[in-house]
Amino acid sequence: IALLMASSLPIGMQANNIIESGDTSRVYDIDEVVVIDQPKEAFRLRQQPLSSTSFNGDLIRSLNVQDVRNLSVFVPSFSMPEYGSRYTSSIYMRGIGSRVYSPAVGIYVDGMPILSKSAFNFHTYDVDRVDVLHGPQGTLYGMNTEGGLIRLYSRNPFQYQGTDVKLSIGTKLHRQIEASHYEKLNDKMAFSVAGFYGGQNGFFRNQYDGSHADLINEFGGKGRFLWRPTDRLNFDFIADYQYTRQNGFPYGQVVTEDELSSATITSPLYGLKAGTQSPNQNRQGNYRRNIINTGLGIKYAGNGFDINSMTSWQFLRDYMLMDIDYRPQDFMHLTQRQLGNTLTEELSIKSRNNSKWHWTFGAFGSYQWLKTTAPVYFDQDMNSYLSKKITDYAYNGMLNAMAKGMAQRLIAGGMSEELANKTARVSTAAAIAAAGGVNINMTMDP
């Protein structure tokens, strides 16, 4: 028995040695590695004391994320509501957000800050990673980041080469095509080009004319060129253009049970069902937008430090038409045109070493020029309504003033007060009618 025990020991040790040296039948899972540049942070995102959510390229494609709004389904405490067009792009994070004017959540695309809130809602494609940083990020990213920050990174042609084509079709004639090409010319130069077209007939119809109330068509193109003349110096040029044309603001009237129960047979509510009604507008709201975002990133790797510079120019030109009475009657409508240019320059310098102490500092400057015209038009039904109100007011004023004087004279002549007032009003009304009456037609200019 002792012999058997002694002989079994080296056999077991030999088996353990085989496993430790390497088992060819064992399968090792290695997560996808995405290499991105962090010009401001000295530590990896997972090592930083903040709450964040990250998506790699495969996850973005599997979730079918088409724009930033789609992320609100998967990111906690993050919301980007749908207001009916790409114009309105309010972002809320942890309950902090801005409905108008300056945003409270910032967006960076390949290191380029997007400052115009009217350009936040754009089609995302060619994206390799998305980081959502929760909470204030003003220390490193400055203004408009009180609620948080969203960073998007495009696929790097130095790391990925090839041609990708994506075709999709869905309900309500959703259609989309995306094509991109990535090529590495040599060890120092690489480029990528991409383009897309997307559209959908929409889910709502305008009851006034039967048109699609949320029809959308959009297209765009993107180019990127990377140049590494030396081991220390890198250049990254990005240009992105997108055009959107959509029927927007498919708003319908909300009708309650109480309103229906009190509606008469002549009421426009008679025969409707409680809830939100289909859009019914005599003017179909629409939105058109051109945006161009260009940026030049420069990075220099020194001895123990990195210098990063991002210079960008952003262009916005859009047009919006909204039937602001949301009714089949022609009361009021709004048109708005925006023309904006934005220049930004961001410079950051950070340490690059293995010591316990890391430092970073920088500067940011921007110039934003925006011209907005937004006249409100009073249309035919509104002008007719106001004309009638003013005409009635003027007519009654004249009638009462003239009849009062005539009645006083009749009473002084011995007529009773009741008969005098009645006679005076009849006579005055006849006199006004004989003179042509009172007719005021007004037109309200914006």
Tell what function each PLM region has:
Residues 70, 92-94, 151, 180, ...:
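Outer-membrane beta-barrel architecture
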Residues 24-25, 36-50, 57-84, 100-102, ...:
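N-terminal plug
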Residues 159-160, 168, 184-283, 316-331, ...:
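Periplasmic-side early beta-strands and strand-to-turn transitions of outer-membrane beta-barrels
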Residues 1-22:
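Cleavable N-terminal targeting peptides that direct proteins into the secretory/outer-membrane pathway or into
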Residues 89, 103, 116, 125-128, ...:
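Outer-membrane beta-barrel translocator/receptor signature
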